Curated annotation (Swiss-Prot):
Family, per entry: Belongs to the UPF0178 family.
Alphabetized InterPro entries for the sequence: UPF0178 (IPR003791)
Lineage top rank: taxon: Bacteria
Name the UniProt record assigns to this protein: UPF0178 protein Bpet3884
Phylogenetic placement of the source organism: Bacteria, Pseudomonadati, Pseudomonadota, Betaproteobacteria, Burkholderiales
Length: 150
């Protein structure tokens, strides 16, 4: 299982959890972003800087992620694309996206986009919390354990 991270919007605390998990579980970890990223020295961890542009990092992840890989992203369209390739998807808040749940998330995203286009303030996501951090760490551990048993 290769771990791919949509790193532009991924919180630093989540990246730190992923760095430790890559070492602990001996899994390759690739962070993809349109900016320079710092990573700890490890043969398992690398950062890919893609050119700036709309969905360039997403396109890189879609192109390279494969069946059984894990993709970390809060980007619903990206999640839908990699799910089609049989990858696993986990949000930085610890929500596991599946083929069943992604349709609902895409519909909700589209509805919120329509409201914003109509000038309605829909607010933003809640601030990232300790509970989100714990939820992510726990969900990641469950996925890593399941992968190790397979």
């Amino acid at each position: 299982m290769h771990i791919w991270v949509d790193a532009d919007a991924c919180p630093a605390v989540i990246k730190d959890i992923l760095f430790r998990a890559a070492q602990r579980w001996q899994r390759p970890l690739t962070l993809v972003a349109n900016q320079m990223l710092r990573t700890p020295p490890s043969p398992l961890i690398r950062a890919i800087q893609v050119p700036r542009g709309f969905d360039v990092a997403d396109g890189y992840i879609v192109e390279h992620a494969g069946s059984g890989d894990l993709v970390i992203t809060g980007d619903i369209p990206l999640a839908a694309q990699v799910l089609e390739k049989q990858a696993l998807v986990l949000s930085p808040r610890g929500e596991r996206y599946t083929a069943d749940t992604i349709r609902e998330r895409l519909s909700m995203r589209d509805m919120m986009e329509e409201l914003r286009s109509a000038g309605i303030d829909t607010g933003g996501p809640a601030a990232f919390s300790q509970a989100d951090r714990r939820a992510f760490a726990n969900a990641l551990d469950r996925l890593m354990l399941a992968s190790a048993r397979a």
